[in-house]
């Protein structure tokens, strides 16, 4: 297959486009992976921490309600508390169901099953506490409360393990997100470096296979324009338009050598004939003896000269057509070079925009990591507050038990334990305040989560913009632009030289036509002189004038041919 210049440039830019598409595709895949990991953090690990923490809080609330249930003796109040505790148990079951949907590992599933078993055990003890409270069996109730405390502590251990597991998963997802980003950055840098190397290779290839041959042909054309035909053109082993142009120039030089050499020979012969004609004319004046022989020689010379002029004119027409063809090829190459230059400029602008957008993405991902770390600190604050609530709950438990025991022993006089009851209410208030603190911290955590989502959505938008712009060339386009500009200038010089050579060939054609015309006139004069012998004196004068004119034209032709060096 013939690999023309246009096909070469098409392959070059197709290669660059494929590299840019590869860079953009890797960038999009990496950003999709980052978005997936972010969704995993938000929808799985963070929701898991929130869900399991809320189970811990609701269970503590249920334990507090149990103690309140044993303190009161009013049936309506006990019914109200029982109804509230049933609602809390339904809430616990609902939260367990919701958390189960976020489980993704066997270890987490195993811990969840253990938690479910412990919750069921706690619920069974709870039912017995309610039954003992309604029957006013305080000894049994106290024993059951001790069991619930142990069961609750056991549940807390499992809950803590689940929280740690979710926190570990969140940290792992963050590390994987950063690894994906750094990996994508390395791949992008490698592909950009590869693009630069390929562009440099293309630039060297164009310089060697296109620019240098054009410079050599330009130098040869300059020699031809100066009339130097002695140098042989170096053969170009290329099957594209440059090869065709080089071959046409080689043929042109060969044809010019033949034409110039033949023209020099013809001009010398014409000059010699004109001198002979002048001598013959002078001799004819002194005697008519040699008129017939001289006229025959001149007639033969004029006929030969006319035939030679026709041959030269045909050769010059072929030479002019070859020059026109080479000139048209030069214009086509010049237009192609201009298109390549425009594409190189556009590629430089797009690559600069793409690099700026990748820097913006790097900044946004760093902000997202900081926000996730802040969320981790808030989770630790929640655990501290939960410990405070546990301490208050334990004190409340002891005071409520003491109040219940004393009231049972004192009977009617148990009303004097109002002080203990007041202390219980104060501790209950402390529990309420701690719960409010937990709520506020959880709300702050949710706000941080929304902030993380906003930053990551912003990074995704920037990646999309970067992908749209990463479809063209890299930084090495500037070198290609300079090379193509140099190629275009060189081609223009070649086409200008070809145009000048065309004008010179037209001038030579006109001179040859003048020679043919003079030859025909000379032949007509000779025939007229030969046929009209009685007017020989007058005819010889006319022939002498024609001979002088022919000699002048021959001298002019010799001067023209003298400009060429064979």
Curated annotation (Swiss-Prot):
UniProt KW Transmembrane keyword: yes
Membrane topology: Single-pass membrane protein
GO molecular function, one term: transmembrane signaling receptor activity
Keywords assigned by UniProt, alphabetized: Cell membrane, Coiled coil, Membrane, Signal, Transducer, Transmembrane, Transmembrane helix
InterPro entries referenced in this protein's UniProt entry, alphabetically: Chemotax_Me-accpt_rcpt (IPR004090), HAMP_dom (IPR003660), HlyB_4HB_MCP (IPR024478), MCPsignal_dom (IPR004089), YvaQ-like_sensor (IPR047347)
Example GO BP: chemotaxis
Cellular compartments per GO CC: plasma membrane
SMART domains in alphabetical order: HAMP, MA
Top-rank taxon, per record: Bacteria
Signal sequence interval, chain numbering: 1-31
Domain Methyl-accepting transducer, residue spans: 280-530
Coiled coil regions, renumbered to chain: 74-110, 536-566
Domain HAMP stretches: 208-261
Compartment(s) where it occurs, according to its Swiss-Prot or TrEMBL record: Cell membrane
Stated family: Belongs to the methyl-accepting chemotaxis (MCP) protein family.
Annotated function: Chemotactic-signal transducers respond to changes in the concentration of attractants and repellents in the environment, transduce a signal from the outside to the inside of the cell, and facilitate sensory adaptation through the variation of the level of methylation. Attractants increase the level of methylation while repellents decrease the level of methylation.
Protein name: Putative sensory transducer protein YvaQ
